[in-house]
């Protein structure tokens, strides 16, 4: 792989995670006036419009196989992931959801092992996963480990992790068609919004634009729609196409670390030594997961990846 291209893939993943790790601040503000379903719909509608304005060209229909991949990516990565996560939060503790969703990299690695060529599970990834998981446990429970299970909510959270892993597989397959990343993300958002429409009638959704008279609501929704949705899904999709589903997903380990840092810097919350240690172990896990396999020299002089 071209080093410059690989570096750009890592940078795209880091930019994505830096923004995703701070979205909780905007979501917290918006929840005072909007339901979770309303935030979800408006942010992706804004994101879709932004992508169309940036690049008006749309991918034409080619064949049903390709269209099913787009539909699957929209259903899994936009509609189901956020719906399942939001529903899970109403049935179980946020700490449970955070921990369960943090297994996305491992789920992605297992799915990629069986469904994608050239993306096999490696020992370094497993070691990195264990290190990151210990770190995330320290961050989430902060030394106060109390096992509080809620089967329905926890199953929903596990479902969210599973569908996001599936989304990465869909995006890796779609990257083979070499479409412009913005056009590709447009189509995924379009299907995500279409699949979201039935949910609008099932959940608490009110089409009340008066709430956008507040500058705070407008700015926070624009951040979620243009920054966290349009920009971040485009950069994430690019990263998956360049690095692969497994390497990209490992960056998800950073989300709780960034969330903790943002809480300290922006909300002036206290940082504990346990959370700091957890952050260090999580970043170590990410580093180990991203290590390249060493090349072994065969008897005939050819190289192979270990």
Curated annotation (Swiss-Prot):
Keywords per UniProt: Cell membrane, Membrane, Repeat, Transmembrane, Transmembrane helix, Transport
Compartmental location: Cell membrane
Top-level taxon in the UniProt lineage: Bacteria
TM ranges: 11-31, 34-54, 68-88, 97-117, 123-143, 151-171, 188-208, 222-242, 248-268, 271-291
Record membrane topology: Multi-pass membrane protein
Chief localisation class: membrane
GO CC annotations, alphabetized: plasma membrane
UniProt-listed InterPro entries: AA-Vitamin_Transporters, EamA_dom
The keyword Isomerase is assigned to this record: no
Pfam families xref list: EamA
Annotated ranges, domain EamA: 18-141, 162-291
Protein family (similarity comment): Belongs to the EamA transporter family.
Family annotation (PANTHER family): INNER MEMBRANE TRANSPORTER, S-ADENOSYLMETHIONINE_S-ADENOSYLHOMOCYSTEINE TRANSPORTER
UniProt protein name: Uncharacterized transporter YbhF
Organism expressing this protein natively: Bacillus subtilis (strain 168)
Lineage: Bacteria, Bacillati, Bacillota, Bacilli, Bacillales
